[in-house]
Amino acid sequence: MSKKQGANKSLATPPPAAESNKNAAKSVDKKSAAAEKPKRRYFGLLTRKEKWVLSWRGRLVVWGALLMLGLIFILRVHPFLAVTERVGCEYLVIDGWVPNYALEESIAEFKGKSYVKIFTVGADPLTGKNIEEGDSIALEAYNRLKWMGVDPAVMQAVPAHIKYRNRTFQSAMALRHWIEENHEPVTSFNLVTLGPHARRSRLLFEEAFDGKARVGIISVTHREYDPKRWWKYSEGVKEVISEGVAYFYARCFFHPGKNDIN
């Protein structure tokens, strides 16, 4: 055999080390393919697969983020719900179910600003003794204000004779209907309510008036708990959670139909 032929044969035949590496690579590829293929048991009802999980650093980051969000919620949710944003107006609307101390603050608001009239609103009582036909929370608030010394000439009770469904919205609709039927020149008003109920009340009154009047809101501070530490009081937890859920529902899912509006 010539030297040239020997050289060509040497080039055509891979060295033993290269052949070994090639076989090892094929073996690794086969093992990888076998590992990637999910293992099945019990006629394919169970499958075993590889998955990614959080490391301890990842879990620490996730828990830290959740803790931060929780703190932000605790500190910001009450001021968000118990909002006070007045508008310039001559009319004061009072949620009839508020306690007497809220009515006292409403009287101070009325006397300290250029209001000319008070409307009390509310639906039928849910519970109570000696309830007579025609009684309403709006009329009860009217009588309490009268007893506190407010001149009846500057007040008007506007009851919404409904007991169970959409009480705040129906109270707003009753006020709108009264204003339209009596041709009262109301283009804006401030609504007085209690604590975290404020943001939802304003939303529902704006829904009811549908742009025909600007709605301001005044939230009277709830005295049964400290608003800055509401999570330490059962009444505070109940108010914030219930009103938070109710506001979310009203904002996202409440769409009044013709029966509600009429």
Language-model regions, residue ranges each:
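Short alpha-helical segments used as structural interaction elements across diverse proteins
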Residues: 54-56, 73, 248
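Hydrophobic membrane-insertion alpha-helices, especially the h-region
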Residues: 59-75
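A structural signal for short, hydrophobic/glycine-enriched beta-strand patches
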Residues: 78-232
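A transmembrane-helix-recognition feature enriched in membrane-embedded lipid enzymes
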Residues: 232-260
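N-terminal Lys/Arg-rich, disordered targeting/topogenic segments
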Residues: 1-54
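Residue-level signal for threonine
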Residues: 55, 61, 233
